Amino acid sequence: MRTPATVVAGVDLGDAVFAAAVRAGVARVEQLMDTELRQADEVMSDSLLHLFNAGGKRFRPLFTVLSAQIGPQPDAAAVTVAGAVIEMIHLATLYHDDVMDEAQVRRGAPSANAQWGNNVAILAGDYLLATASRLVARLGPEAVRIIADTFAQLVTGQMRETRGTSENVDSIEQYLKVVQEKTGSLIGAAGRLGGMFSGATDEQVERLSRLGGVVGTAFQIADDIIDIDSESDESGKLPGTDVREGVHTLPMLYALRESGPDCARLRALLNGPVDDDAEVREALTLLRASPGMARAKDVLAQYAAQARHELALLPDVPGRRALAALVDYTVSRHG
């Protein structure tokens, strides 16, 4: 039965004792991050701690800690370091993304660029990357290589998104590739490092990495659906943000391929950023009624099935069941 004692970061792990151990693992990651970031010069501190103190889902540290439950040493100190490295990289990308997107709000608070300007936000993100690099050096050359490869994928995905879809590339294939690079790659690295440093077998580590990539892609698709389907800000941004910014997510791309009576109006609305609140509401209403939403949810279900296939081949231990609960949470939160 779901109780507060069994829930960690919104995910019902089913067992209060196991959940307490996982919660403690995530708390160790947060404590290490806090310790490392507070060592920065005071000229950095307010902007550097801005997003960290704003909270967030801590999805990536949670995935690291849960992946570590597959190995025989889930509480190894290196698992904590790996979780901190992954979350610092994630926070750094948020600072940089908000500058590129000119976002004004992040996690219910003014974004760093809105509060201090672009230069400060970029430098805060850079410092987070520097701190993550210093931490990962503790884990040895293989971990450094994994993180370097992940950096490359993150930047490639951002560049691919920034330059847009060329005429000879399918827009939906492009979208899914960008999501895998920008979101799936980092969660895949979380699974790989969590498995590695808990002593999981090589085969299990590879499976956890693949699982992370699939779950990361599903997580982003769910966020994109929430941005249209939800009346609240459960994705961490205002509903309709993607419409306002002119960002074409999976539900929009499918909706734009439809040929119903409302499609011409929807195409006109989604032709670029939408500033007018009434037009944002109109676009959201049309998107919610479009078959494109159902198609996007079908794709999300396919990724969930792929994740469950990977899970089924992991050992039947509490960690696997917890990862299955996380997959269910990822898919179900779009409502």
UniProtKB/Swiss-Prot annotation:
Record GO cellular component, one term: peptidoglycan-based cell wall
CDD domains: Trans_IPPS_HT (cd00685)
Swiss-Prot/TrEMBL keywords: Lipid biosynthesis, Lipid metabolism, Magnesium, Metal-binding, Transferase
DDXXD motif (motif): residue ranges: 97-101, 223-227
Residue numbers binding isopentenyl diphosphate: K57, R60, H90, R107
Manner of cofactor binding, per the entry note: Binds 2 Mg(2+) ions per subunit.
Recorded GO MF terms: (2E,6E)-farnesyl diphosphate synthase activity; all-trans-nonaprenyl-diphosphate synthase (geranylgeranyl-diphosphate specific) activity; geranylgeranyl diphosphate synthase activity; metal ion binding; prenyltransferase activity
UniProt binding sites for Mg(2+) 1: D97, D101
Key word Lipid biosynthesis present: yes
Classification via Pfam families: polyprenyl_synt
Cofactor: Mg(2+)
Pathways per UniProt: Isoprenoid biosynthesis; farnesyl diphosphate biosynthesis; farnesyl diphosphate from geranyl diphosphate and isopentenyl diphosphate; Isoprenoid biosynthesis; geranylgeranyl diphosphate biosynthesis; geranylgeranyl diphosphate from farnesyl diphosphate and isopentenyl diphosphate: step 1/1
Note on domains (UniProt): Contains the canonical two aspartate-rich DDxxD motifs, designated as FARM (the first aspartate-rich motif) and SARM (the second aspartate-rich motif). The primary role of the FARM and SARM is the chelation of the divalent magnesium ion cofactors that assist substrate binding and catalysis, but it may also play a role in determining product chain length.
Family listed: Belongs to the FPP/GGPP synthase family.
Name by which UniProt lists this protein: Nonaprenyl diphosphate synthase
